[in-house]
């Protein structure tokens, strides 16, 4: 039996020499080295706080990631490396299953190595393997759905739609973005002979499984006025950068890596031109649909990334057919590795920060865009937002302790965004600070927490605006961090006294969903 036929016929069996096993272990090892460097990212702090306020949903995400983040933080004793173990494991599994998926669709060892290496070294996945975020499980679950569709096509076992439903339900509990993939995938399936399977009862049983899993979150969103839809409108109408179709496509070469994107394009070609499996065509069409959706709706460039592991697999299989000579295959693998290693420090925190800045300048590297309208400093946003939070909390604590005892009893920190508020809630506990308040995203729902607004500590903002809203104010300190985002550094710390409108009644005015 050939390697190709073996890949189509067999299931998973463990073999230490398999590319999937080796690449998965290398991925995990690299992230165990890197993930403890720098510090907690803005969103990670926020997810921990959200998870400590357990609920069936949140303004800006489903419940599972905050729950896992808070659990990881507690079990790891607040250690950064322990906290980021789950992202590392999820990414290692994604890389391993990308290589294994190649085997399942009939690819040989070269194709397995090529697809796995491209996934391992894709900039977008390297950083997602670091940060605990709503994207942590996206590539893994989207690949899981593609895997199920392939096995459905190969075996005809319609009970696999139940597995499809389980994966979908899990993914929806981590991020709603898979809904776009499901729509795009349905359009892709309708364009293939597989459309007949969409009428089978097992499809609807699988959908029922997913619906039951996500129902509590849907009910929570309904009870709170569908805040996630309001958040989505804010992203479309201003938060996210507007990219032309050409610029959005060009960004994909930074997300997947230049050579990785070439393999993805080969996967699209393989799906459109005489595909061996109709799932490949459905995925190619799904990519086109997703591209149109995200360009027109101002989606961030990395929103397309979760579909890439499956396309890498189909692309690598097609390249394997084209490159018959060992020399050509070896050159392809070496090229992917060399270029990937050169780009890795741009998205993997393996260098001391000053060394990273010099390295970035030396190679002229452009980190992948986060897709937001933000002024960037010396570091890309995903690194910059790991710095300055502890120092900020310490400065706020100094201001808080300098207040007279009577004022301290009434004082509260108001965060202009959830990053500031979460940093106070996480780092301020040990410094004697009370829980923070904010109007940003889920902090708005937690309200003023019993504070009347008579003494508020706040960072930055418009002093003239404060003069209108409060009886008096003063500058009590300053925050400064060389590496933080520009709008989070070199800012005054104000103490505001005597709010003119009661905080409880004016709270709706601070609502800020973004």
Question: What kind of feature is each model-predicted range?
Answer:
Residues 85-106, 144, 148:
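Transmembrane-helix motifs of polytopic, lipid-linked glycan transferases
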Residues 13, 103-106, 145-161, 267-275:
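Membrane-interface transmembrane helices that cradle and orient dolichyl/undecaprenyl
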Residues 124, 130-138:
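Short acidic/glycine- and proline-prone juxtamembrane loop motifs at membrane-interface regions
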Residues 24, 115-123, 168, 172, ...:
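Short helix- or helix-capping micro-motifs
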Residues 3-4, 8-21, 98-121, 140:
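Transmembrane-helix signature of polytopic, membrane-embedded enzymes
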Residues 148-169, 200, 204, 208, ...:
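Short hydrophobic alpha-helices at membrane interfaces in multi-pass membrane enzymes
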Residues 321-360:
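Signature aromatic-anchored transmembrane alpha helix within multi-pass, membrane-resident enzymes
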Residues 170, 181-280, 294, 344-355, ...:
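Transmembrane-lumen/periplasm boundary regions of multi-pass, lipid-linked membrane glycan transferases
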């Amino acid at each position: 039996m050939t390697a190709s036929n073996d890949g189509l016929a067999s299931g998973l069996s463990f073999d230490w020499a398999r590319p999937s096993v080796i690449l998965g272990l290398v991925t995990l090892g690299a992230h165990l080295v890197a993930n403890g460097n720098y510090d907690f990212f803005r969103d990670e702090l926020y997810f921990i706080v959200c998870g400590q306020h357990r609920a069936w949903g949140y303004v800006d995400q489903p419940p599972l990631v905050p729950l896992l983040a808070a659990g990881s933080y507690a079990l790891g004793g607040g250690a950064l490396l322990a906290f980021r173990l789950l992202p590392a494991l999820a990414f290692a599994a994604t890389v391993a299953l990308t290589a294994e998926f190649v085997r399942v669709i009939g690819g040989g060892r070269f194709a397995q190595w090529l697809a796995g290496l491209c996934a391992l070294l894709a900039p977008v996945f390297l950083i997602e393997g670091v940060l605990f975020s709503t994207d942590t499980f996206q590539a893994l679950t989207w690949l899981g759905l593609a895997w199920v569709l392939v096995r459905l096509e190969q075996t005809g076992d319609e009970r696999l739609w139940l597995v499809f439903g389980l994966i979908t339900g899990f993914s929806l509990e981590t991020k709603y973005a898979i809904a776009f993939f499901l729509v795009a995938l349905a359009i892709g399936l309708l364009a293939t002979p597989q459309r007949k399977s969409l009428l089978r009862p097992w499809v609807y049983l699988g959908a029922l499984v997913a619906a039951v899993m996500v129902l509590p979150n849907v009910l929570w969103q309904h009870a709170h006025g569908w805040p996630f839809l309001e958040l989505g409108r804010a992203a479309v109408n201003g938060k996210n950068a507007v990219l032309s179709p050409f610029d959005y496509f060009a960004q994909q070469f930074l997300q997947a890596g230049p050579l990785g994107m070439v393999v993805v394009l080969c996967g699209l070609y393989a799906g459109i031109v005489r595909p061996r499996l109709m799932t490949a065509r459905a995925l190619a069409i799904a990519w086109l649909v997703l591209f149109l959706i995200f360009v027109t709706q101002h989606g961030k460039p990395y929103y397309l990334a979760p579909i890439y592991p499956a396309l890498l697999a189909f692309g690598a299989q097609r390249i394997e057919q084209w490159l018959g000579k060992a020399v050509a295959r070896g050159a392809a693998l070496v090229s992917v590795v060399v270029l990937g290693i050169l780009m890795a420090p741009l998205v993997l925190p393996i260098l001391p920060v000053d060394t990273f800045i010099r390295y970035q300048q030396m190679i002229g590297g452009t980190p992948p865009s986060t897709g937001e309208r933000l002024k960037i400093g010396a570091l890309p946003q995903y690194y910059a937002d790991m710095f300055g939070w502890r120092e900020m909390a310490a400065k706020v604590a100094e201001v808080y302790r300098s207040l007279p005892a009577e004022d301290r009893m009434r004082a509260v920190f108001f965060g202009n965004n959830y990053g500031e508020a979460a940093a106070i809630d996480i780092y301020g506990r040990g410094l004697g600070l009370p829980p923070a308040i904010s109007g940003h995203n889920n902090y708005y729902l937690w309200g003023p927490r019993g504070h009347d607004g008579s003494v508020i500590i706040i960072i930055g903002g418009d002093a003239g605006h404060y003069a209108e809203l409060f009886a008096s104010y003063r500058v009590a300190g300053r925050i400064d961090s060389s590496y933080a985002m520009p709008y989070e550094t070199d800012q005054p710390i104000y103490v505001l006294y005597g709010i003119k409108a009661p905080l409880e009644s004016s709270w709706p005015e601070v609502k800020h969903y973004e």
